[in-house]
Every structure is written in C-alpha cells, then in structure tokens.
Amino acid sequence: MTENSTSAPAAKPKRAKASKKSTDHPKYSDMIVAAIQAEKNRAGSSRQSIQKYIKSHYKVGENADSQIKLSIKRLVTTGVLKQTKGVGASGSFRLAKGDEPKRSVAFKKTKKEVKKVATPKKAAKPKKAASKAPSKKPKATPVKKAKKKPAATPKKAKKPKVVKVKPVKASKPKKAKTVKPKAKSSAKRASKKK
C-alpha cells in the first residue's frame, strides 16, 4: 500500500517538468526575429550574435545552437529573413520587412485560416470537375476534322475512273477476233482453188 502511494507522487513531478519546458521560451523563430530587431543593424546580425541574445534573454536547452541553425534556414526559405552575407546558416541576416512583429501575429492567424481554407479546397474540386467538362468540347473539334476526311475520299473515287479507261484496251482482242475470220476466209479461198 505504501509503495503505491510513493510511486504515484513521483509521476506527477514528471508531468510538471514537461509543462515547464514548453513555457520556458517561445518558438525559436520568434526569438530569432526578436534578436534581429533588438540589434537593428542595417547590414544584418550574425548567427553568433543571435545565439548570444537568445541565450542571455531566454532559458534555452543545450541543443539551442542546432535549433537556431535550423530555424534560421527555415526563416530564410520562407522569406521572413534575408541573408545579406554568407551561405546557409552562417553569415548575417536581416528581416525581410520592418513589420515582423505583426508578421509573427499573422503567422498564428494564418494557421487558423489554413484550417478554414481546407474546406474551400474541397469546394475547388468540383470546379476542377467543371473544368474537365469544357475539355470535352475541344475533343469535339477532332470530330469535325474527321468530317473533312470523307470529303477527301471522293478524290480517291476519281482514280477508279482512270481504271475505266483500261477497258478501251480490251477492244484489241476484238481486233484479234477480226483476224481470225481472215484466216478462215483464206482457208475458204484455198478450198475454192482446189
């Protein structure tokens, strides 16, 4: 009985520690933006100066340096930060626009709006289906071309007319028939002479 009572309170502090870790500091992206705003350098602030500012103003863990590198890269790719010098996470960075504090609030609003926008995307799918329907009309145009092709077939019909000219050559056998009677007549003449 006593063992169960001692084990139960031990589990509660672990949950409390987990909640404290989430409340110790804001997001790294927000801290980086705050650090750059605090320095106010036109040339931009370096990653080392950003790390110093974050470590001095916020309670950050041991892996803060790697987290800062990753978040700086993300902010550069999203367009929140502009890299003035260097490549990757090294170099100096400055805010893309001066309205960054409003932007950080806008990011939270956009997250909520993204859920709302998800439903219009479903409504956009029927629009895609409607766009498929007009695509059937261009398919009807090749049918018109097919109608033109039968018009080309009468031209082919003219060629058989040329074939009809060939029976005229068949009249030559008729001449051959006329030759045969001559042979008979010569045979008759020969018989008369006898």
From Swiss-Prot:
How is this protein annotated for GO cellular component?
A: actin cytoskeleton; euchromatin; Golgi apparatus; nuclear body; nucleosome; nucleus; transcription repressor complex
Q: What is the lineage of its organism?
A: Eukaryota, Metazoa, Chordata, Craniata, Vertebrata
Q: Where is the composition biased (Low complexity)?
A: 1-11
Q: Which organism is it from?
A: Mus musculus
Subcellular localization(s) per the UniProt record: Nucleus; Chromosome
**Post-translation: what modifications?**
ADP-ribosylated on Ser-104 in response to DNA damage.
Residue(s) carrying ADP-ribosylserine? 104
Q: What is this protein called?
A: Histone H1.0
Q: Taking every annotated instance into account, which residue ranges of this chain make up the domain H15?
A: 24-97
Q: Which residues carry this modification: N-acetylmethionine?
A: 1
Q: Does the keyword Membrane apply?
A: no
Purpose? Histones H1 are necessary for the condensation of nucleosome chains into higher-order structures. The histones H1.0 are found in cells that are in terminal stages of differentiation or that have low rates of cell division.
In this UniProt entry, the residues modified to Citrulline are: 42
Task: Tell me the residues on which N-acetylthreonine occurs.
Answer: 2
The entry assigns this protein to a family as follows: Belongs to the histone H1/H5 family.
Q: Give one Pfam family.
A: Linker_histone
GO molecular function terms listed in the Swiss-Prot or TrEMBL record: chromatin DNA binding; DNA binding; double-stranded DNA binding; minor groove of adenine-thymine-rich DNA binding; nucleosome binding; structural constituent of chromatin
Task: Tell me the InterPro entries matching this sequence.
Answer: H1/H5 (IPR005819), Histone_H1/H5_H15 (IPR005818), WH-like_DNA-bd_sf (IPR036388), WH_DNA-bd_sf (IPR036390)
Keywords, comma-separated and alphabetical: Acetylation, ADP-ribosylation, Chromosome, Citrullination, DNA-binding, Nucleus
* Ranges in a coiled coil: none
Specify residue ranges for compositional bias: Basic residues.
105-194
Q: Which residues cross the membrane?
A: none
Q: Which gene encodes it?
A: H1-0
Q: What is one process in the GO biological process aspect for this record? A: nucleosome assembly
Q: Where is this region: Disordered?
A: 1-28, 86-194
